[in-house]
C-alpha cells in the first residue's frame, strides 16, 4: 500500500508536468473504485486549470481552477475553484505520459492535459490513474481551501509529521492514557498522520522502542526519540523514492528503493544490522510487525 512517502514522491513528480495545464478531456473507463466516480466528474473537470497539488496524509489534493470564461460569467460552482481528492488505495498509481500506451484493464481514468494560460509552449500529456485492486478513490469537492480541513475524509487526520508543531511533547500528549500498543497507536493516524506499516516498524527500531510497548507508558524522553525517528525515516524514504514492494511506481514509472536498506521490515530471521540478533516477526492487528528483540525494549 502506498504510504506517505510514496504519495509525496508522486506529488513531487507530478508538479512540473501537471501544474498550470488545462484539463482538455476526462476519460473514465471504470467508475467502481472504493467510492464510485460520480457521473458528473467529466463535466465538472473539463476546461479547468490545475493550480496546485497538495498532500494531506495519504491524500493528493489537486486544485482545479475554473476556466476564465466561467469566472467572467459570474457566480456558481462552475465559477469557483474546487479540489480533486485522490487516494491511491493499495495498488494505485498516477503516471504522466507524453504519448500513453493503449489503456489496460486496470487503467481507470485519464486526464488529457493541454497547455494552459501560463504553459503555452507545453506539449499535451495524459495523467493516468491505474489501480488493479480498485481500493483507490477519485472524488470531487467544491470546498474552498479554508474549508478543506473539515472534509469528512480529512477532518480526523492527525498532524503532519513534518509540521513544526510535531515533536516529542505532541506525541507524548497524544499517547497519554492509551492502553494499545505503540505501533497500533501510530497506525491509527489521529495523533500523527502517514506513519504506515513499513515506516512504523522502521521508526520504532530507530527509536529503540519495542512495537508491543503500551503507548500510554512511553516517557516524554522516549516520545522525543520516536518523533525524531518518524521524521528521519519518512524524510529518508521520500529521498529514496519511497518503497516498491509490489505495485508502486512514481509518476515517471520509476521504482522506489528505500526497502532495500530497511533495518527490520520484511527481514524476519535475518541478522540485525546493528547487533546481529535475528529479526523477529509478529502479527499486530492482522499486520506484520518486525523488530529486533535486543535493540528494542
UniProtKB/Swiss-Prot annotation:
Record has Repeat as a keyword: no
Location of the active site: 2 (schiff-base intermediate with dna), 3 (proton donor), 58 (proton donor), 287 (proton donor)
PROSITE patterns with a match to the protein in the record: FPG_CAT, ZF_FPG_1, ZF_FPG_2
Reaction equations catalysed: Hydrolysis of DNA containing ring-opened 7-methylguanine residues, releasing 2,6-diamino-4-hydroxy-5-(N-methyl)formamidopyrimidine; 2'-deoxyribonucleotide-(2'-deoxyribose 5'-phosphate)-2'-deoxyribonucleotide-DNA = a 3'-end 2'-deoxyribonucleotide-(2,3-dehydro-2,3-deoxyribose 5'-phosphate)-DNA + a 5'-end 5'-phospho-2'-deoxyribonucleoside-DNA + H(+)
Alphabetized SMART domains for the sequence: Fapy_DNA_glyco, H2TH
GO terms under biological process: base-excision repair
Keywords per UniProt: DNA damage, DNA repair, DNA-binding, Glycosidase, Hydrolase, Lyase, Metal-binding, Multifunctional enzyme, Zinc, Zinc-finger
Cofactor(s) this protein cannot do without: Zn(2+)
Annotated function: Involved in base excision repair of DNA damaged by oxidation or by mutagenic agents. Acts as a DNA glycosylase that recognizes and removes damaged bases. Has a preference for oxidized purines, such as 7,8-dihydro-8-oxoguanine (8-oxoG). Has AP (apurinic/apyrimidinic) lyase activity and introduces nicks in the DNA strand. Cleaves the DNA backbone by beta-delta elimination to generate a single-strand break at the site of the removed base with both 3'- and 5'-phosphates.
Residues that bind DNA: 106, 133, 178
Its EC number(s): 3.2.2.23, 4.2.99.18
HAMAP family named among the record's database cross-references: Fapy_DNA_glycosyl
Protein's UniProt name: Formamidopyrimidine-DNA glycosylase
GO molecular function ontology, one term from the record: 8-oxo-7,8-dihydroguanine DNA N-glycosylase activity
Listed PANTHER family: FORMAMIDOPYRIMIDINE-DNA GLYCOSYLASE
Subunit structure: Monomer.
FPG-type zinc finger segments: 263-297
Amino acid at each position: 500500500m502506498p504510504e506517505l512517502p510514496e504519495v509525496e514522491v508522486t506529488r513531487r513528480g507530478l508538479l512540473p508536468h501537471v501544474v498550470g495545464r488545462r484539463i482538455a478531456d476526462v476519460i473514465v473507463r471504470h467508475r467502481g473504485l472504493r467510492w464510485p466516480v460520480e457521473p458528473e466528474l467529466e463535466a465538472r473537470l473539463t476546461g479547468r486549470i490545475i493550480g496546485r497539488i497538495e498532500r494531506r496524509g495519504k491524500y493528493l489534493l489537486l486544485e482545479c481552477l475554473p476556466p476564465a470564461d466561467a469566472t467572467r460569467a459570474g457566480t456558481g460552482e462552475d465559477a469557483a475553484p474546487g479540489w480533486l481528492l485522490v487516494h491511491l488505495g493499495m495498488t494505485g498509481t498516477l503516471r504522466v505520459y507524453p504519448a500513453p500506451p493503449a489503456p489496460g484493464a486496470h487503467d481507470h481514468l485519464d486526464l488529457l492535459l493541454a497547455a494552459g494560460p501560463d504553459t503555452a509552449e507545453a506539449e499535451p500529456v495524459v495523467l493516468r490513474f491505474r489501480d488493479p485492486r480498485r481500493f483507490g478513490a477519485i472524488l470531487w469537492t467544491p470546498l474552498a481551501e479554508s474549508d478543506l480541513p473539515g472534509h469528512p475524509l480529512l477532518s480526523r487526520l492527525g498532524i503532519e509529521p513534518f509540521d513544526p508543531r510535531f515533536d516529542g511533547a505532541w506525541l507524548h500528549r497524544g499517547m497519554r492514557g492509551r492502553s494499545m500498543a505503540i505501533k497500533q497507536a501510530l497506525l491509527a493516524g489521529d495523533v500523527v498522520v502517514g506513519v504506515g506499516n513499513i515506516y512504523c516498524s522502521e521508526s520504532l527500531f530507530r527509536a529503540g522502542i519495542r512495537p508491543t510497548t503500551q503507548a500510554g507508558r512511553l516517557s516524554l524522553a522516549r516520545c522525543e526519540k520516536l518523533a525524531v525517528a518518524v521524521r528521519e525515516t519518512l524524510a529518508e524514504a521520500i529521498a529514496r523514492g519511497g518503497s516498491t514492494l509490489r505495485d508502486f511506481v512514481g509518476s515517471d514509472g520509476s521504482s522506489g528503493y528505500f526497502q532495500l536498506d530497511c533495518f527490520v521490515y520484511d527481514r524476519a530471521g535475518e541478522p540485525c544490522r546493528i547487533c546481529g540478533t535475528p529479526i523477529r516477526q509478529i502479527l499486530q492487528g492482522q499486520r506484520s510487525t518486525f523488530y529486533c528483540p535486543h535493540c528494542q525494549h
